[in-house]
Every structure is written in C-alpha cells, then in structure tokens.
Amino acid sequence: MPDVQLDVISIDVPFPGASPGEVESGVVTRIEEAVRNIEGIADMRSYSNPSLARVRLDVDTNYDALAILDEVKMAVDRIANLPGSIENPVIYRNQRQQRAISVQIYGDLDEVTMKGLVSTIQDEILSLPSVTKADIQGARPYEISVELKESRLRQYGLSLDDVAKAIRRSSLDLPAGSIRSDFGDILLRAEGQAYRKVDFEKIMLIHKSDGTRLTLGDIAKISDGFQEAQFYSMFNGKPSIGISVFAVGEQNQINISNEVTDYVKTRSQTLPDGISIESWGNGTAYLSESINIMVSNMTMGIVLVLVILGIFLRVQLAFWVMLGMPIAFLGAFALLPLADGSLNLLSLFGFILVLGIVVDDAIIIGESVQTASERDGHSLDNVIRGAKRVAMPATFGVLTTVATFIPLLTVPGGFGALPAAIGSVVVLCLLFSIIESKLILPAHLASMKPLQANDHSPLRQFQNRFADGLKYLVEYKYRPLLIKSINARYTTLAVFVGMLILATGFVMGPYIKTVFFPSMSTDFIRAQVEMVDGTSPAQVVKVIERLNDSLVLLNEEQPEDDKFLKNIAAYVSNTNGNVIAELKPVDSLSQSPENIAVNWRNSVGELSGVKTIQINGAQKSHGHSKDINFKLISPNIKELEVAAELLHQHLRTYDGVYDIENSNTGSIPEINLKIKSSAEALGLALTDLASQVRAAFYGVEAQRLQRGREEVKVMVRYPREERESMGNLESMYIRTRDGDEVPFTAVAELETRVSPSTIRRTWGKRAIIISADINKTITQPGKIVDDVILGDFALQLAQRHPNVRIELGGASQEEDELTQRMLLTTTLALFGIYALMAIPLKSYLQPLIIMGVIPFGMIGALIGHIIVGIPFSALSVYGIIALAGVVVNDSIILVDFVNKSVANGMDIVEAAIKAGTERFRAIMLTSLTTFFGLLPILTETSLSAQLVIPMAVSLGFGILFATVITLILIPCLYVMLNDIKTMRIRLISSRSASSES
C-alpha cells in the first residue's frame, strides 16, 4: 500500500500513578488551552487515561502539518504549571508504519532469560543491511524494585523518600573536571553508578560514628526484574516474545523481509533446546504475490489491447500506436517519485487502469491517418493531414480526461491515499501520451511503407474480412439505427433518461448493495477483548486462553484439506487482550475469513467479565475500528451520560447493527484522600499526605539508568503484600515535617467514589463516543447515520437534552468529509472540463451537450456491479469519475467532426449521421481497448485485487455503455441543440414581425 502520512499531531504525556480526573485537570486542560488558538487545527480530541494524557490534533488540509507541529511543540514548552511528576511530553506527527514481517521467539523459558535472548536477536536483526526499525512486542519493560516494609522503616527512622535520596547520592557517575598539568589534562571522574541488584545492595543508608553500618540490602528486598504489569504472551500455545520489523520511508519491504527470513532460518540452528524462532505475518509475501498478479494482468491487458488494435488497424500502425504505451509508462515511472508516489499495489493498478486509455489519443491519430491513407493513398502529406485533422480535439480530449482524475488526488484522510496513488499514475501517463502522440507517432506513421495491394497473407485476409464486416455493421445496422434515433430524437432522449432513472432506482433499492467504505478480506482474523474495570489479571488470561483454544479446536475439527490455521498469537495487557490468527492463503481456504470469524465467535459463547469483544475477519478500508461513530458533547456530565445511554438503546433497535460500544461504560473505584483539620496543628498539608501515600503505593522513582538499549527505572515502595488492601492504607504512618510519626487515620479521612476509566473531550468539552459495527448485507452505515442525525431521534434528543450536541466521528465523519470534498472537487473538475471543451469546439453551448451525457455513463457502471456481484462503494464512484473523462474524450472527437462538416456546408442531420458512421471505428476502438485492458482485473479473484475491482468495474462496463451514448445520444443532442437554436430564431423573428406590424 502507499505510504500514508496522516495530518494528525499527537501529544502524549505520561503521568505515572494519576487517575483520569487528575490527568484531565492537571495536564489535558492546560494543553488544550495552550494549543486551541493555533491556526490550522481542524479538530482537537483528548483522552485522559490512568497515568496517561493524550491529545490528538487534526490539521486542516490547507495547512502545512510540519509547521503546525513546530507551533504545537513551542506552545506545550511554554506551559509553566504542569505537574512536576509528569514525564516529558512526546509530540509527534502520526504515521502509518508498514510492517514488513514479524519474528516470534517462543518456548519454555523464564521471562528474564527469554527477554535477554530476544534483546540479543533484536540487535542482530537491526544489524542486517536493510533493517532500521525492529520493535520488541509482548514484553514488559525492565525495572529495579526496592521494597521496604513499614516496620523496618520505622525501626531505623527512615522514610521511602530518604531511601530514594540515598540511592541518588550513592548511585551515580559524575564528571569532576580535570587537572591541567604540564603533561596535559587529566580528567577527573566519580564512577559509582549501580546497575545490578548486587550494586544496589551495597548502597549505604546509615553510617554511625561507632562504626554501625546499614546498607540497602540489609533492610530492603531488591528485585532486578520487570515493571508490575500483567504479562501474557503466547505463540502457538507457548510463552513468547515477538519482534516487529518495519519498513521506514522509502525502504524496500521485500528486501527487508528476505533478509529477516534468511536470518531466522540461520538463527534457528543456534538456539537452545526447547526454544524456537519463526517468522510470520510476512506482508511482503502478499506484496510479492500482488505485484506478480498485477504484472501478469498488465501483460495480459497489453496483449489484449494489441490484439484489438491489430484487428482494426494495420499491423504496423497498431505497433506504432502500442509503442506509445511503454513511452508513457516510462515517463510516468520516472516522474512518480517527484509526485510523492511509489511502486505499490495501487500504483500498479493505475498503470493497468490507464492501459486502454493511454492509447486513445494515439488510436484517434492513427485511425485518422489510416482513413486518410485508405482514401487518398499513403504519403507524408496525407499522414500530416490525417494527424492535423484530429490533433486539436484529441489533445483537449486527453486534457479533459486528466481533469476528471484530478479529484482523485485531493481526497482527504488516510482513505484518500488509495485513489491518489492511482490518480497520480494516470495523470502522468496521459500527459506523456500527449507528447508521444503529437510529436513522435506521426513520424513513425510517415515511415510506414504503403499497403501492398497484392498482400494475401492470412492476417491481411482476416483484417480485410473484418473490415468488410465492420463496414456492413456500420452501413446496414448502425446507420439505420442512428437515422431512426435522430428522427425520433426526443423519444431517444426519453429512453435514455428512463434508463438512468431505473439505474438510480437500483442503487436506492435493494438490488445493488451500497457501502461507502468496502471491507477487504485478509490473511488474518483478530479478536480484541476489553474487560470490565477491576477484573483480575487471572480472569483476563482465562478469557484470552478460551478464545485461543476455541479457534484451535475449530481448526482441528476441520478435514485435513480444510484446515485454515497457520499461526496463532495471544497477548494480554492490563484489562485488554488480543488473539491474532494467521490463516493459510485465502485463495486456498474452503471458507472465507469472515465466515471463520463468525464461527469462531459462535463457538466461544458467553464470556463473563467482558466489556467489549470484536472478532473481525475483514479489514476495514476506512482504517477505523467501527463502521459508525457518534460524538455526544456537553458541559453537563450527567445530561451527557443520559443522552449517551438513550442513543445506545436507539441503535439497538436497528437490524444489522452489532457490537455497540459506549465509551462511558468503564469506571474505576477511586479513593479520595482528605486531610483532617487536626493535622494542620502537626504542620501537615494535603501535599505531604498525598506524596507519602503515593510513595508507598505507587513508589518513588529514585533514578533511571541506561542498560543497553533500554532505560530502567529504579522504584522505591512498599512490598506488594503491604499495598493490596484498604487495611494497608489505613495502617500506614505519616511522617510530619518534624520527623514524628502519626497513624494515617489520625490525620486523614477517605472518601470512596467511582470515576470513568477514560475521560474524552472534544474542543475542551466532555464527550462520549457511541460506535457500532454494521452487517452490510442487512443495512447500510449511511442510512443509519442519516436516520440518527436527520431523523426523529435528533429532534427527540434536542427536546430532552438541549445542552447535548451530536456530531459524527470516526468512519462516519470521514465519510461525510469525503462526500463533501468529492462534490467540491468534482464540481471544479466539471468547470475545468467545460473550459477545455469550449476551446476546440469554439462554442459555449456544445460543451453542455457533452457534459449532459456524463450521468448516463453511470448506467453501464451499475449494470457491471450487478453482473460482478460487488457492492457499490466510494471506489466505484472514483471509477465513474474516471469514466466521465473517457466519455468526454470520444464525444469531443465526434462533435468536432460534425462542426467541420457543417462548416463545409453540409446539412446538420447529414453531418451528424456522417460523423457517427465515419468515427464509428475510432470510437469503438478506444472503448474496446479500455475494456479489454481492464478485463484481466475484472476476472481476477485474488485477495490483492479486492480494492481495485470496483473502479475497474465502473470504468470497464461503463465504457461499453458509453460507446452507445457517444454513437447514438450525442448526435441526437447535437441536432436537438440546433432545434433549440432554430426555435429561438423563429421566436425572435416572430416578435420582430409583430412589433413592426
């Protein structure tokens, strides 16, 4: 896929140990105020999670995201009142990374040894020539934990903060200047940094004058291990840690994948017994297959186009026409990097899409030259005359096609990268085709030898028979039909309008399924689980194991030839879990990944303690987790919660709506500390109380040290058994500023409450997100969205909760933005097409005739979707937009021919008939080359073609029907325009006569 640079800026601020409410008030609100007035920010969303603040800024497409990023960094740096315990803010521009391959190390090995081995393997992978980014997945960060019991601290009159300060004093490396001697400078340095458990045990806490010494190892339990977090990572049923290898920037994914695969094969021979290493999720295998499929389809398309040209035209002429294709392709390929393009699945399809179109210009020139040569003989003058006759309309015809592809380059969002990758290739190819057909092709055609009259070769005889058959078709089938259509031109128009209305009805009705964002089958199925807050780690693991085992059992129940499972991985993090299954190639499966996902979900049954679960066998092309998404915004939190529940229940009334999620359903039990008035007499303030409780239960960060690639925190805190209950809190002692110790209950009181697990805000106001998935075989996301936003529910919500505002979010918002942008850019493109047609036609009215037939091209596209059996989507619309350019291209040639005949004194009706019959071969040829160039893709069943087939169907089938439009409807409309002019002249004449009388 093309590299996607999203116009989204993220601000992540870790706030260790803080509740969502503290994160909101202490960090999020201050960042929002600092950045809200920066020009160019289109949307601002924030998420206050336990221990983490996240702010997401959408950049307006009319602004430079990198410039906005710099402004955001400066604005955040200027905030002076952020809490002191936060970590450094991380500010970056979002970018979708291309995962090339994953490596999994698994087996029966303890966590410490396993991570050490994985770190070594990570270093070895990063040393490969093509690899620059390889991240460890499914492993906890290292941490040195210093745990001291309350009783031991009291025994020696120490506090946790005292211990942390002692570590900072003794564990450090400090440069101490230098001695400037006559023999040179001698550096002075104190080296005492502790790195391992044994080093920390020797740190001195107390050293009395009588020689009594107390070290950290005497009173503390020191663990050189991992952070306190839930850890569960399995691969094919065994403990595992993974490494994800990414392609960065313009790196070649295939080279990276090949190097890593070769490394894994070699490294597997040196691992200890019981430990395995395996590469999986090889995205480049899919890429290589896709490239091979696209190249084979391109080759087949070229052959088919050449065959069609060889049937209609002289073989030499067909060859020179075809030569324009590689010239245009090479030119586009050379300039593609300058247009921020790359060689990927979609750009390859762009070359296939333009196969038949790129030769249209050359076909028109070549066919005109052949016609002139057949009529007047082959000579340089006749070649020039034939080329000049159609040069002007052919050039502007290609330019109008270019104009129709411009909207594909301006689609916003991540989804916009798909049509943009195609459009950039097509535009470059078409521009090069103009140069080739006008400057190079005529010279080649002039160099051809005259056709030999005594040529009786089988090919020439076949061409003669075909030419005779074509003449018969034109004279005895097409010409009479055209005459009848022109004579009954208003009836003909009515028939076409009726067909258009009928086709539109098919879209609006149940006959053609419509989805804005089509789903795509993949080689993976995924289960994502979020547990209710407060769920024990053991319960989360139990649910993930059940999901894992149920899929393995489902696979084992299949006959040997129908087994679908290749690899399966499971991960748990706090209250979330994921199971990812790699399937065998989709083409070899007896059932679709979507069906496997449904069967998996049914086999699992009810899962206790699960807040949300998603099992997907298809990838959503819009890139969002849900198909529909609504944002409810209000300053009144209670009213907001009621409105959110109302919308949640309303969505449950629709058929086909499932996995409805309410972002406000999660909650965390919270204990609020309050200081008693009696504590003030002891010199205690709330900050003293809070800091000591935080030190005991979260810990004091004594220092951070660098060990190899990882930064390791040194945390000082109570032992785990003294942090597990309310009793532990109530039994702790608080130290006054004078050094005295008082019971916690004597100076503090507790207030229990519940707070949301995540606080969402939009433009500084609280927001709740209601989202859901849609079964597109039952209903359409757009219909649900329109009904909620524009229907009775919106009125009911406004009446009951006037302070609550409802907006679209996620995929729904992107669909709305895409629709608006498509309407705007398509309208501008139509104005551009009109201007480009007005120049060669030298008329303001005749371009309207041609533009009037553009909607009729949709009829063939819709018929194609019915035949192929695919839903009508946004990608289908892009195909119709491209179709408009081809329709206009052929129509300009026809109308220009009529104009020249009329200018020579021919009757308009006769001129229209002559134009149709004489341009029949050229128009038929351009249409057939376009269709047959796309035919291999239209018949493709592979996974890699799913994204591009809707565009190919719209353009391929649409162009066949567009041929009928051009050859029948355009002549009728031309004559009808003359009727209107004649009627206007008569009306003016009659008025003049009346005024004179």
Q: Model segments located where?
A:
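Flexible hinge/switch segments at interdomain interfaces of large molecular machines
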Residues: M1-I9, R45-S51, I86-G107, D135-P141, ...
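Extracytoplasmic/periplasmic
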Residues: M1-N81, I86-P89, E111-G138, K513-E582, ...
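Extracytoplasmic/periplasmic membrane-proximal domains and adjacent transmembrane bundles
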Residues: I9-D12, R54, A80, E124-V303, ...
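Short helix C-cap/helix-to-loop transition motifs enriched in small/turn-promoting residues
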Residues: E32-M44, N62-V90, Q122-V131, A166-P175, ...
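Helix-loop junctions and hydrophobic alpha-helical segments within the transmembrane domains
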Residues: W280, L287, I291, G366, ...
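Hydrophobic transmembrane alpha-helices and their membrane-interface caps
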Residues: V303-I311, V315-G366, Q370, L428, ...
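Transmembrane alpha-helices and their membrane-interface boundaries in multi-pass membrane transporters
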Residues: L355-V369, A391-T410, A417-N464, V579, ...
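Signature of alpha-helical transmembrane segments and their immediate interfacial
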Residues: K388-V390, Q461-F516, F630, T917, ...
